[in-house]
């Protein structure tokens, strides 16, 4: 039997979508009695975590094992059964990843000679500060507003 180790995101309530509603629990398996078809039916997941981000329905990250008539696609798999090995609220990590991505994007533009308004750096610094607990949400919003104003000018 094919068993694929993969990643899957859940909403905060940790329940399946699409009128199923079953709660996902670490250490337990959930199954469906259908022939898996990618993007249509079955228990889906992504072998690479970066791909799982594209299908994210919420902040709860699960390490899963998919089995049972497994169908493979480029960025996902589907099977009859998905076993949740463990789960974690990944919201803080997802926020940090988003800020890191934006900071890397700005650095890439600078290396290519694009002039970046300093208010963009202030917004990134404010976002990092917010994640560290040293900056308020109001301060982050003010920095973001300044960046948007600079872009519009």
Report each predicted region and the residues it spans:
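Short, glycine-biased loop/turn motifs at secondary-structure junctions and
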Residues: 1-153
């Amino acid at each position: 039997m094919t068993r694929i180790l993969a990643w899957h995101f859940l909403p905060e309530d940790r329940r399946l979508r699409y009128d199923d509603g079953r709660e996902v629990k670490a250490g337990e398996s959930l199954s469906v009695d259908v022939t898996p078809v990618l993007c249509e039916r079955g228990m889906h997941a992504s072998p690479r975590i970066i791909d799982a981000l594209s299908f994210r329905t919420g902040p709860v990250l699960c390490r899963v094992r998919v089995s049972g008539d497994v169908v493979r696609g480029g960025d996902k798999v589907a099977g009859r059964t998905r076993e949740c090995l463990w789960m974690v609220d990944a919201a803080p990590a997802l926020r940090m990843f988003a800020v890191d991505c934006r900071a890397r994007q700005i650095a890439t533009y600078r290396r290519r000679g694009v002039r970046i308004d300093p208010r963009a750096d202030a917004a990134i610094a404010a976002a990092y500060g917010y994640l560290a607990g040293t900056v308020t949400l109001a301060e982050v919003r003010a920095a973001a507003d300044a960046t948007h104003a600079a872009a519009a000018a």
